[in-house]
Amino acid sequence: WIMGHMVNAIYQIDEFVNLGANSIETDVSFDDNANPEYTYHGIPCDCGRSCLKWENYNDFLKGLRSATTPGNSKYQSKLILVVFDLKTGSLYDNQASEAGKKLAKNLLKHYWNNGNNGGRAYIVLSIPDLNHYPLIKGFTDTLKQEGHPELLEKVGYDFSGNDAIGDVAKAYKKAGVSGHVWQSDGITNCLLRGLSRVKDAVANRDSGKGYINKVYYWTVDKRATTRDALDAGVDGVMTNYPDVIADVMNEAAYKSKVRLATYEDSPWVTFKK
C-alpha cells in the first residue's frame, strides 16, 4: 500500500492517486463537542508541504465517496484504503467514546450513503492516544445500533503514538478488538527515525500469535528509506511522494518481491510469504 500523506483537500485525492498512491491518509480535527469538523492538519507539518489545506469533514467524505464508488464519473479504481488520522488530542479523554459515535454517524451518512452503494474503500481509524481506546467501541456500537454491522468488515484500527507494542496490545484488549489491526511507526519527514520498532512490529505480525495484521511506516520520501522499509517487511509506506515509492518498487531488487495491493487484497489478512 502506497499511502499518500496528508490528503486534506478533495482535489488532492486525484493528485495523489495519479502519482501512484492506492491509499490516502486524511487528518480529522474535532470541535469542542467531539464532532468531526475539518480535514485539517495545521502547523507544524511535514517539511516541504503546505499544512493549511482543509475541507469540512462531511464535504470531504462526499468527495471521497465519489472517488471510491464504481460508476461515478470521479471514480478512481486504484484507491482502496483510507486512513483517518484522528486528531483527538484536542478532546478530553472522556469524550473519546462520543467522538467514535459521531464519526460513525458521519461516515454512515456521507461516505457509506446509509449502506446504499456508498464508497467501497477500506477505512482505518488511526488514534494517537492509547487512552482514547473507547473511541473504537463508540464507533462499532453505533454502526451496530444504526443497523449496519456489516460495514465493520470495512473498518480497521491503528494506534499511532509509537507506544511500546505490549501497551498497544493491552489497549486493543480493553477496546475488544481482535483483528483488522494496522500498526504504524514513524516520524515527520523533517527528522530521522530508525527501524527497530518497525522490526518489532513485523515480528509481532509474523509470529502468528501477535495482535498485528499489517505494518506501515511514515513518512517516507527518499529512495534509500523506502528500500530500508521494504527490506524490513512493511505492508505500507506513507509518503508525500507516491511516485518515489512506485519507482523503488519497480527496481530489479523489488519487482519480483512486492507489488501494489489491489481491492482483492484484504487489508486485514496478514500476508503469508
Swiss-Prot record:
Primary localization class, coarse: secreted
Gene Ontology molecular-function annotations: lyase activity; metal ion binding; phosphoric diester hydrolase activity; toxin activity
EC number(s) per entry: 4.6.1.-
Reactions it catalyzes: an N-(acyl)-sphingosylphosphocholine = an N-(acyl)-sphingosyl-1,3-cyclic phosphate + choline; an N-(acyl)-sphingosylphosphoethanolamine = an N-(acyl)-sphingosyl-1,3-cyclic phosphate + ethanolamine; a 1-acyl-sn-glycero-3-phosphocholine = a 1-acyl-sn-glycero-2,3-cyclic phosphate + choline; a 1-acyl-sn-glycero-3-phosphoethanolamine = a 1-acyl-sn-glycero-2,3-cyclic phosphate + ethanolamine
Tissue: Expressed by the venom gland.
Catalytic site positions: H5, H41
Cofactor needs: Mg(2+)
Cystine bridges: C45-C51, C47-C190
Positions of transmembrane segments: none
Keywords, in A-Z order: Cytolysis, Dermonecrotic toxin, Disulfide bond, Hemolysis, Lipid degradation, Lipid metabolism, Lyase, Magnesium, Metal-binding, Secreted, Toxin
Places the protein is found: Secreted
CDD domains found in the cross-reference section: GDPD_like_SMaseD_PLD
Annotated binding of Mg(2+), by residue: E25, D27, D85
Gene3D superfamilies assigned to the protein according to its UniProt record, in alphabetical order: Phosphatidylinositol (PI) phosphodiesterase
Gene Ontology CC: extracellular region
Co-factor binding comment: Binds 1 Mg(2+) ion per subunit.
Biological processes, Gene Ontology terms: killing of cells of another organism; lipid catabolic process
InterPro entries, A to Z: PLC-like_Pdiesterase_TIM-brl
Family designation: Belongs to the arthropod phospholipase D family. Class II subfamily.
Free-text function comment from the UniProt entry: Dermonecrotic toxins cleave the phosphodiester linkage between the phosphate and headgroup of certain phospholipids (sphingolipid and lysolipid substrates), forming an alcohol (often choline) and a cyclic phosphate. This toxin acts on sphingomyelin (SM). It may also act on ceramide phosphoethanolamine (CPE), lysophosphatidylcholine (LPC) and lysophosphatidylethanolamine (LPE), but not on lysophosphatidylserine (LPS), and lysophosphatidylglycerol (LPG). It acts by transphosphatidylation, releasing exclusively cyclic phosphate products as second products.
Protein name as annotated: Dermonecrotic toxin LhSicTox-alphaIA2biii
Species in which this protein is naturally found: Loxosceles hirsuta
Phylogenetic classification of the source organism: Eukaryota, Metazoa, Ecdysozoa, Arthropoda, Chelicerata
